[in-house]
Amino acid sequence: MNCAIIGSTKIAEVHAEQLVKNGVREITFISRSEKRRKKIISKVKKKINKKVFFFHSDIKILKKNFFNIICICSNTEIHHKHLRIVSGLKSIIIIEKPIISLLKLKNRYESYLKNLYKKNKRIVVCYPYLFLAKSFKKFCRNLKKIDRIIFEFQTGGTAKFEKICINLMPHALSFFHIFFKKNFLKKNINKTNPIVKKHIWQTSFKVSEKVINLVFKENYKKKTSVKLKLNDLVLVRKTKKNRSKFINYIQNYQTNKTQNINNPMEEFYKDLFKNMNNKEYYKINKKLTLNIMKKNNFFLN
């Protein structure tokens, strides 16, 4: 099985590692910069001890060669351009969230996505926080009693102002889609005006008698972490490095105990490869994506 990865950033490295773990043995990195393509191949080779063939090229390779999987890890602002190029191909398309930039397409995003899904029925948007939510949920015995929630998400990203919301809201919405009942995204929401700063985007909203505060932060100098406060219970997801392996864990601030959890990205890829030939899997991801984009647009406007 072979794969083309569009992009040469850190997230492209992460996807490459997971693809190799699931049996991909030939990867072509696609980028305008030959220097960046060679650099990312060098980095990935150091992390992988399996026999994998690496190649690199520009975007034109997609018209010449067939790839079983095409993974889009480019800047969100140009997702729509890359999707236009690959949508008519017979490859499975994996794309980093959000599927497209709402600031770029604005009110045209719905018609764009409608036409996109007509051309390719095997598009999967990467939502690892579906699986992170399952890990957090194990700490909460009675969700009905929870009426105050704070979801604080900090990353080492570089997005600023409204772009922080576009970048991180899909994580939060997919998280609550699993954490609460699956009709969460369809419920009516009463929101407050957001507070938008250079490195912070935050808002609060009420849904089903629960008040939820969202606090998104992006700062390239900070490590990624997720803090979930449920009434008086405070849970934080962190990572630590043990030799060459990253360990994911949740810390309970009430008991000061920690519990290791599965890597959400690993869980996403296991689920993807398990359902690669399952038509219903792609339909569910499509429905989730359309609901997330609709709610994200609601919070922006």
Residue ranges and their predicted role:
Residues 1-48:
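N-terminal Rossmann-like dinucleotide-binding module
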Residues 154-223, 287:
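Rossmann-like dinucleotide-binding domain that binds NAD(P)(H)
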Residues 30, 38, 42-47, 69-74, ...:
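C-terminal helix-rich "cap/oligomerization" subdomain common to oxidoreductases
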Residues 27, 68, 147:
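Conserved acidic residues
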Residues 194-198, 207-271, 280-284:
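NAD(P)-dinucleotide binding in Rossmann-like oxidoreductases
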Residues 24, 89-91, 118-122:
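A short helix->loop->beta-strand "cap" motif at the edges of active sites that frequently abuts
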Residues 3-5, 52-114:
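Beta-loop-alpha module in the N-terminal Rossmann-like domain of NAD(P)-dependent dehydrogenases
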Residues 100-157:
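A contiguous active-site-proximal alpha/beta segment in oxidoreductase catalytic domains
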